[in-house]
């Protein structure tokens, strides 16, 4: 989980920076990603597609208008997809309830970005991984 904490740290900062840079078009992309995430949750079985989740986080990175941060996001997502620990976590968190909670977190992040409230965006982004870590506490025991 240490690696997840490190990734969360820079993702929080990306959300904070995106709040200051996001354009109307960026916000539209984030809304579309959340709509996709909602459709995926409504129509898929546990363990279904998470394309909306990925698109939401990508849209936040793109809203910084910083190509290095976008590339950092893409690389970290790829690492996540290939990480045995993350795959194990997802095999245990097949319940869509967790994904629904994460969607609520995403809506809070988006609300802060719409208001261009960098502090609120960072705080909302910080809260989300804490919930994931709590949910996974029983999965990874040292």
Question: What are these language model-derived features?
Answer:
Residues 3-87, 106-108, 120-132:
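Conserved amphipathic alpha-helical segments that form helical-bundle/coiled-coil interaction surfaces
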């Amino acid at each position: 989980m240490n690696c997840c904490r490190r990734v969360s740290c820079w993702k929080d900062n990306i959300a904070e920076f995106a709040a200051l840079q996001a354009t109307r078009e960026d916000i539209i992309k984030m809304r579309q990603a959340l709509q996709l995430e909602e459709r995926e949750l409504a129509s898929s079985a546990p363990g279904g597609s998470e394309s909306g989740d990925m698109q939401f986080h990508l849209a936040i990175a793109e809203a910084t208008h910083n190509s290095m941060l976008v590339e950092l996001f893409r690389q970290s997502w790829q690492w996540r997809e290939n990480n045995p620990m993350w795959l194990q976590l997802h095999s245990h968190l097949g319940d869509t309830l967790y994904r629904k909670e994460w969607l609520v977190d995403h809506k809070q992040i988006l609300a802060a970005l719409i208001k261009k409230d960098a502090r609120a965006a960072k705080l909302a982004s910080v809260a989300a991984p804490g919930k994931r870590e709590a949910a996974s506490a029983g999965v990874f025991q040292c």
